[in-house]
Amino acid sequence: MSGVCHSRRQALYGLAGLLASSPCLRAAQAPELVGEAPGRMTPIDEFANVPEFEEMARRSLSERAFRRIAGGGRSALERITFRARMMVNTKALDLSLELFGQPMFAPILVGPASRQGQLDSDGELATAEGAGAAKATLVTAERSGTPFAKTIAAAPGAWRQFYPDSDVGALSERIQAAVEAGARTICLSLGEERGGRAGVPVRYGWDVLEQLRDAAAVPFVLKGVMQPADALEAAHRGIAGVVVSNHGTGQAQGEAEPVAVLPAIAEAVAGRIPLLVDGGFRRGGDVLKAIALGATAALVCRPVLWGLAAYGATGVQKVVEMLQTELAKDMVQVGAVNLAAIRRDHIRIHSR
């Protein structure tokens, strides 16, 4: 870990000690923004939580642009609450992990999104700079307005996401070019379309996925897995990991939220490969919930784009660091000193 990463971790340790010794383990959540004058941009240091950035993004964008990044399904996450545990020494709090051989400060990755130039003039480059400043691993979309070489210079260790292409050979070449440019992991988003007939997604069989896995020569991850059988087959086929996500099926009407299907997938995979998950993450505690359900880490996208739209790279950094700090606080609440200590019995799932 770098010196900056070490100092930030020390700050989290201090926070953990303070919370653990406090008679009030966790302060009440700050209220949402109220009484703001129309168009006024709140100073970034005044934010109490990540959801407040959504309103600032709305004020910064056209209605059409804002609709792209608004909302997101959260009902499954909101049905989960924590079970607090006292008398646990959490002064040595540690959020770090190693994923596909890559050390990470926390289990919070910045998820991929295309056309970020519609949100901020610096687009994906600003996101990369903010993610890099927050020591978060960035997953970049192939349909990016910023050359990958610039992105990875700002966010070392970045991953590259690709989409199925009817020309498998051309896709293999693009994957290899990304790896040569420094991509640490390749992610293929299932169900997306490139090079196929209009409105008809390109679907790959396992033979093609294995071919692309071999072309990557770095960890190869599938994004868009929602079925336990698919995740288990991926593990058997030598896929490095999967992202539980409904993006791969086009978010069809009635589609389950990723967190809702995560436990069944985790049970089927039984630790054979890492499981990542996206969808609806707004608070650091949401990430803790996902880990308790079997995830290794979470991809966060929309809130990062709110920060980008309102404050550029600084907003991205602030959003990610707030999520990291909230995760630390909530780990203290449940008595988990590190990610391996997070268990299913730290949470309760309510029926409604």
Where are these regions (language model features)?
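C-terminal helical cap(s) of enzyme catalytic domains, especially alpha/beta-barrels
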Residues: 258-264, 309-327
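A gly/proline- and charged-residue-enriched helix-loop-helix capping module
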Residues: 133-152, 159-168
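Hydrophobic faces of well-ordered beta-strands that scaffold small-molecule active sites
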Residues: 108-111, 138-140, 158-162, 186, ...
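An N-cap/entry alpha-helix motif that binds or orients negatively charged groups
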Residues: 31-104, 198-204, 340-342, 348-352
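Alpha/beta enzyme core
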Residues: 172-277, 293-295
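Acidic (Asp/Glu)-rich catalytic clusters
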Residues: 148-155, 179-180, 235
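N-terminal secretory signal peptides and thylakoid transit peptides that target proteins
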Residues: 1-19
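Conserved, mostly hydrophobic/aromatic
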Residues: 62, 110, 131, 188, ...
